[in-house]
Amino acid sequence: MTGGKWQDRVKSVEQRASSFQSSPLSCPYKPRLSQPWQPSSIWRLFPRQNAAIAFAQHIKQDVHIFSLEKEGSDAGQRIFLVTSYSELWHYYSTHRHSLMHCYEVILEGAVCKLYFDLEFHKASNKNLDGKMMVAKLIQYVCEKLEEVYGLHCSAKDVLDLDSSTSDKFSHHLIFMLPNAAFKDNSHVGRFIHDILHPALTNLKKSNPEAPGENRDDVEGTQAKRRKTEENDLGFLTVKNEKGQEQLFVDLGVYTKNRNFRLYKSSKLGKNAAFIVAEDNKFVPNPSKQITKDERIFLASLITNVSFTGQRILTYDMTQKSTAGSECPTLERESHSSDLLGDQKTSPFKEVDEFVLTLVCKDGIQGSIRRWNYFACEQLLVYDIEKFRWCHNVKRFHKSNNIIIVVDLKEEVWYQKCHDPECRRQNYRSSSFPLPQEVCMSHLLMEDEEDQAYLTDELGNIELAVTAPAESTSTTPSEDTEGWGDWPDDPAYLRALQEVEEEEEDEDEEVPDELLLQAVNECE
C-alpha cells in the first residue's frame, strides 16, 4: 500500500467517524418491559415542567409526570420524567441511585386522593407521641368525612408512610376513600383548611404571626362546638426548631402542580426514604401480576384515580367581608351526583370550546355545568345542562342531562347519560373523532432543549451529547445524504460478509516499513 492510499484511507476513516458522531447508528436508550400486560415504552426527560406536562397531555400512551432531584445538582433543580406507572416502578426498583429522589407531580385540576404531609422537630417536642397524633388525626378526619360527605372510612383506608429520622418526625397519609375522590388538590386543601380551622384559631391566639383566618364569633351551640374542637385539636400544635408554635399538618402541599415525594424516595442530600409505617393498617388489594410492594407504590400515588363513576367531592368557600375580616362560608353539594366540580374553564380551553359547539345547536343553548379531569386516564368529563339529546334513545330526555367524555389520549369523544335506564345499561355512545385543531398531538411542539437529558442502560441520567454547531450547519456529503433509519438490505449484508471473508483468506499484512513511511509523511 502506497503512502497516498494510506492517507486516503485515514481520511475516509476520519470522515466516517465524524459522520457516526453526528448521526449515531445506535438509537438512544429506550427501556423495555418484558411482561405482556405492561405498556409500551415511554421514557422522556425534560428540563422544564411545562414541557413535560405538554408532552404527557399530547400523546396517546398512558403516561404520568414525575420530577427527579439529581445527585450533584443544585438544590431545588429538578428534571421532569414522563413515563408509565409500570415502567417507572420497573426502573425505580432497580436503579435506586439515579431515581432515589423522585416526586409525583400532582397536576392542576386533576382528580386526586385526600392526602396529608405531617412533620415536627423531635428535639423541640420531646413530650409528643407522633404515633398517637397520627392515629387521632386519622380518627378526626374520618369523622369529618362522614359529617360532610356521608363517607364511612377508618384507619384501614389510610396508607401511612414514614420517613422519620432521629431529628424529625415525618409521615405521609393517603386516604383511599370508598368509591369517592376529590375534584383536585385545591378542594382537598380547602376541606383540610376548614376542618382544621379550630386548631388554626387556637394557634392564632398563642402566636399572632401564625397563619390562619379570622372568623366572626358565632353565637349559640356552634360557638360552643368550635370551642370544644379547639381544645380537642390541641394535639396538632407543635414547635419548630426556633421554639415557635405551628401546625403538625403542612397546609402548603395543596398548590397547583405540586411535587409530592414518592414511596421509597428520600430528599436530595438525605437518606430517609418513605417506608410503610409500623402502625399502618392499610392493606392493598391482592393481585397475581403485581407484587405487594408495587401495589403499595400504586396506592401511594395521589392522582392514580381512574374514572369509574365514583363520587367527585368538592369543597368551596365563598369569601365574604365582614368588618374587615374574611368569613369563609362552606358551600357543598347536597346531592350525591357523580359529576361535581367548578364552573370555571378546564385546563384545556380549546376542548371546552369544542364541547360547547356540540351542545349549542338546533336553537338550544346548552352549557357546561361541571367538569372533572382524570389525569390518570387523560379523560375530561363534562356534565352538560340544557341539552339532553341522547344517542341511546335517539331523542331528548325530558328531565335527565347528558355527559360528554373527551378522551385526550385517543383523541375521541363520546356521550354518557344521567338517565337511570341509560345508567342501568351502562350506556356509552360510539366514539367520535376530535377536530384536528383540538387534538393534543396537533398542538405539541418540541424544541431542542426538551431533548437535553437521556438515560443510559445503567439508569444514569446525563445531559444528551449534541453534535457540534458546525456539523449541524454544514451540508450533508454526497456519501451520506439520504441515509435513513430503515434496516440494512439483506443482499448488502451478504456481499459485505463475502468481502470480509475474502480479505481474511488473503491474510495480507502491510509491511512495517511502509507503515512507518506513511506515518512520517503524514507528520
Swiss-Prot record:
<feature type="binding site">
    <location>
        <position position="78"/>
    </location>
    <ligand>
        <name>substrate</name>
    </ligand>
</feature>
<dbReference type="GO" id="GO:0003682">
    <property type="term" value="F:chromatin binding"/>
</dbReference>
<protein>
    <recommendedName>
        <fullName>DNA-directed primase/polymerase protein</fullName>
        <ecNumber>2.7.7.102</ecNumber>
        <ecNumber>2.7.7.7</ecNumber>
    </recommendedName>
</protein>
<dbReference type="GO" id="GO:0005657">
    <property type="term" value="C:replication fork"/>
</dbReference>
<feature type="binding site">
    <location>
        <begin position="258"/>
        <end position="261"/>
    </location>
    <ligand>
        <name>substrate</name>
    </ligand>
</feature>
<feature type="binding site">
    <location>
        <position position="390"/>
    </location>
    <ligand>
        <name>Zn(2+)</name>
    </ligand>
</feature>
<dbReference type="GO" id="GO:0005634">
    <property type="term" value="C:nucleus"/>
</dbReference>
<keyword id="KW-0539">Nucleus</keyword>
<feature type="region of interest" description="Disordered">
    <location>
        <begin position="467"/>
        <end position="523"/>
    </location>
</feature>
<keyword id="KW-0804">Transcription</keyword>
<feature type="binding site">
    <location>
        <position position="119"/>
    </location>
    <ligand>
        <name>Mn(2+)</name>
    </ligand>
</feature>
<dbReference type="GO" id="GO:0019985">
    <property type="term" value="P:translesion synthesis"/>
</dbReference>
<keyword id="KW-0240">DNA-directed RNA polymerase</keyword>
<feature type="binding site">
    <location>
        <position position="397"/>
    </location>
    <ligand>
        <name>Zn(2+)</name>
    </ligand>
</feature>
<dbReference type="Pfam" id="PF03121">
    <property type="entry name" value="Herpes_UL52"/>
</dbReference>
<feature type="binding site">
    <location>
        <begin position="168"/>
        <end position="172"/>
    </location>
    <ligand>
        <name>substrate</name>
    </ligand>
</feature>
<keyword id="KW-0862">Zinc</keyword>
<keyword id="KW-0548">Nucleotidyltransferase</keyword>
<comment type="function">
    <text>DNA primase and DNA polymerase required to tolerate replication-stalling lesions by bypassing them. Required to facilitate mitochondrial and nuclear replication fork progression by initiating de novo DNA synthesis using dNTPs and acting as an error-prone DNA polymerase able to bypass certain DNA lesions. Shows a high capacity to tolerate DNA damage lesions such as 8oxoG and abasic sites in DNA.</text>
</comment>
<keyword id="KW-0496">Mitochondrion</keyword>
<feature type="compositionally biased region" description="Acidic residues">
    <location>
        <begin position="498"/>
        <end position="512"/>
    </location>
</feature>
<dbReference type="GO" id="GO:0003899">
    <property type="term" value="F:DNA-directed RNA polymerase activity"/>
</dbReference>
<dbReference type="GO" id="GO:0062176">
    <property type="term" value="P:R-loop processing"/>
</dbReference>
<keyword id="KW-0158">Chromosome</keyword>
<dbReference type="GO" id="GO:0009411">
    <property type="term" value="P:response to UV"/>
</dbReference>
<feature type="short sequence motif" description="Zinc knuckle motif">
    <location>
        <begin position="390"/>
        <end position="423"/>
    </location>
</feature>
<feature type="compositionally biased region" description="Acidic residues">
    <location>
        <begin position="478"/>
        <end position="488"/>
    </location>
</feature>
<dbReference type="GO" id="GO:0030145">
    <property type="term" value="F:manganese ion binding"/>
</dbReference>
<feature type="binding site">
    <location>
        <position position="117"/>
    </location>
    <ligand>
        <name>Mn(2+)</name>
    </ligand>
</feature>
<dbReference type="GO" id="GO:0005759">
    <property type="term" value="C:mitochondrial matrix"/>
</dbReference>
<feature type="binding site">
    <location>
        <position position="267"/>
    </location>
    <ligand>
        <name>substrate</name>
    </ligand>
</feature>
<comment type="similarity">
    <text>Belongs to the eukaryotic-type primase small subunit family.</text>
</comment>
<feature type="binding site">
    <location>
        <begin position="117"/>
        <end position="119"/>
    </location>
    <ligand>
        <name>substrate</name>
    </ligand>
</feature>
<feature type="binding site">
    <location>
        <position position="417"/>
    </location>
    <ligand>
        <name>Zn(2+)</name>
    </ligand>
</feature>
<dbReference type="GO" id="GO:0008270">
    <property type="term" value="F:zinc ion binding"/>
</dbReference>
<dbReference type="GO" id="GO:0042276">
    <property type="term" value="P:error-prone translesion synthesis"/>
</dbReference>
<feature type="compositionally biased region" description="Low complexity">
    <location>
        <begin position="467"/>
        <end position="477"/>
    </location>
</feature>
<dbReference type="GO" id="GO:0006264">
    <property type="term" value="P:mitochondrial DNA replication"/>
</dbReference>
<dbReference type="GO" id="GO:0031297">
    <property type="term" value="P:replication fork processing"/>
</dbReference>
<keyword id="KW-0808">Transferase</keyword>
<feature type="region of interest" description="Disordered">
    <location>
        <begin position="203"/>
        <end position="230"/>
    </location>
</feature>
<keyword id="KW-0239">DNA-directed DNA polymerase</keyword>
